């Protein structure tokens, strides 16, 4: 038989699973959090949507995977989105654009604070005493005449150079700051660190906090902040003539060496750079690659751990590799690298909204997903749980959502929904 296709199926939704997000946000009292944290000046007359309603629609679109602003022109007619957001009519692209360009720098800080509060919800729920602050920077490319965009030599592109901090044990985003393209990796990092230490050291009488960062964060100000506040750190150092001379005199070449295998040797030394106020402990690793006669790769990590051997120090640092996955998830999964607006403040707001959406889903995974699904990335979550065909019907006392009965991940959907409904924060 011939197959004919027509776009006349009626008011169906491809995102019936987004009801999980709606239920989860109710459970964590998200509306209350927005009302407490965010105030956006509204001089409009005869407006149909509050700014916070538009903000929530933006978050839903990000979470559902709609990265383009113009997607709102279709989403606004989706019955599932209307019911989830409890709005009879949703906003179009033009209204979302108006909202974005209404936001001030203070509003951006408020958005970021909500994202931080979401991370704190998990830390409070889990009564976390151990925190790993993973510092990094990333690039958000620009392709037009955006304000504050500059050429970033490290990445070889024009764009912005945000500072990011993730909690290394959970993957929650703790801080995300847009910066202009000329910003160095560690620009203002010591100030951001001090803010985070003020925040998290007040949460517990004796928290165990560790800071990790690459060589871009090897600043004496960062070391001093950590030392003065009893915070541990493992931060990579760039090699220099003094360090290389020392380690090259330490490596051992033995007669029974198997040169067909890679060999690594570890050492410790006390080292003081010219700008440091004191000497510090430096772990060193020398690597001779298989097939080579000489050690040719040397790495250095400065730390204030006193009783750890150098190999363990390197193992602690190497776990920072998860950071790249967290950044990739926020940028690729929640569109944090979008810089479509000419205004720097508007692009700051875009990043802050992605920061918030990322933490909503990360918190949802930690609190309501079965253990086998907690590491799932957002693209897979959308495929398994959110992008489900459905139809909505209105009755006198309730709205019913009819899900496809051929959903392969039906069991997972109902499991997560039950976990959300049992959630008590």
Which residues fall in each region the model found?
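Short acidic (Asp/Glu) and glycine-rich catalytic loops that position anionic groups and cofactors
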Residues: 1-3, 34-38, 77-79, 293-298, ...
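An anionic, glycine-rich sequence signature occurring as long contiguous blocks
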Residues: 1-3, 7, 232-332, 415-425
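Dynamic "connector" segments at or just before major functional cores
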Residues: 1-184, 189-203, 388-425
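Short amphipathic alpha-helical "interface-anchor" segments enriched in bulky aromatics
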Residues: 24, 72, 310-349, 353, ...
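Basic, amphipathic alpha-helical segments enriched in Lys/Arg and hydrophobic/aromatic residues
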Residues: 55, 336-402
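Short, glycine-/Ser/Thr-/acidic-enriched flexible segments
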Residues: 138-140, 170, 179-181, 240, ...
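Domain-level cores of phosphate- or acyl-group-handling catalytic modules
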Residues: 183-242
